[in-house]
Amino acid sequence: MSSLQIILLLIIAAITGIASVLDEGQTHRPLVACTLVGLVLGDLKTGIILGGTLELMALGWMNVGLAMAPDTAIASVISTILVITADQGIGEGIAVAVALAAAGQALTIFVRTITVFFIHRADQYAKAGNIKGIEIMHITAMVFQALRVMIPTLIVALISVSAVQAFLGNIPDVITKGLQIGGGIIVVVGYAMVINMMNIPYLKPFFYIGFLLAAFTDFNLVGFGALGLCLALLYQQVMQKQSAHGAVAAASDSGSVAVYDDDDDDLDA
């Protein structure tokens, strides 16, 4: 791995670490982070495949109250580096990502506990009207979030390929298979949570059509994407026509009422 690749990986790690807190650019999501890492390491295809697989798993990962979700940023960046540099399969990448996400969860809690100090300092600066101090506290807290992903990434990037291959090769098959099965279960849970959140009756037929086509046809992802786009455009056009027809009908009804009122006024006069 060249020095330029290591620098680019550290930049990606910093961006994903900060984005995992800001939740605006969504660059910490596996589909984005793994793709960027794959692009830097020269294996974009593996990055996209691993990112898409991990994204399905991460659909069910979210913070609920004080319960911290697994760390998608560390899992995405480091698992992609290990899979590509050690020439491993997607199954091994999923197994490594699940373990890294659990370890990153503890690291996230540790870093967020440290940033509480900066929050209290920012409150003090706010009372004193020190805007510059508040900005410094925000930036410092984000630096800690960036280092949370950058330091493990640097350690993994500096490890030799042979050492990584030896480490992954020594993992027992029972652990690897177990984590792969667990990852598959997490995918199903993530899908169920998304469908539950999108519990809109008039959209359910589209879900059923998609599942039936996936089960009984040989469509690939490109075909499903094109079909979904066509159905979305068709649905939008139908809804627009119905809305326009309803607006015309409402306008005609209101016009007839207005004429009737004018006649009443004439009679009263």
UniProtKB/Swiss-Prot annotation:
Any Pfam family matching the protein: EII-Sor
Q: Where in the cell is it found?
A: Cell membrane
The domain-related comment in the record is: The EIIC domain forms the PTS system translocation channel and contains the specific substrate-binding site.
Q: Carries keyword Transmembrane?
A: yes
Task: State if Oxidoreductase is listed as a keyword.
Answer: no
* The organism of origin for this protein: Bacillus subtilis (strain 168)
Q: Fetch the NCBIfam families from UniProt.
A: EII-Sor, PRK15065.1
Q: Which GO terms describe its cellular component?
A: plasma membrane
The residue ranges crossing the membrane are 2-22, 35-54, 64-86, 90-110, 149-169, 181-201, 206-226
Record's function text: The phosphoenolpyruvate-dependent sugar phosphotransferase system (PTS), a major carbohydrate active -transport system, catalyzes the phosphorylation of incoming sugar substrates concomitant with their translocation across the cell membrane. This system is involved in fructose transport.
This chain's protein is named Fructose permease IIC component
Q: Which GO terms describe its biological process?
A: phosphoenolpyruvate-dependent sugar phosphotransferase system
The chain positions of domain PTS EIIC type-4 read: 1-234
Which InterPro entries does this entry report, sorted A to Z?
GatZ_KbaZ_carbometab, PTS_IIC_man
Keyword entries, A-Z: Cell membrane, Membrane, Phosphotransferase system, Sugar transport, Transmembrane, Transmembrane helix, Transport
Provide the coiled-coil residue spans. none
Give the bilayer topology. Multi-pass membrane protein
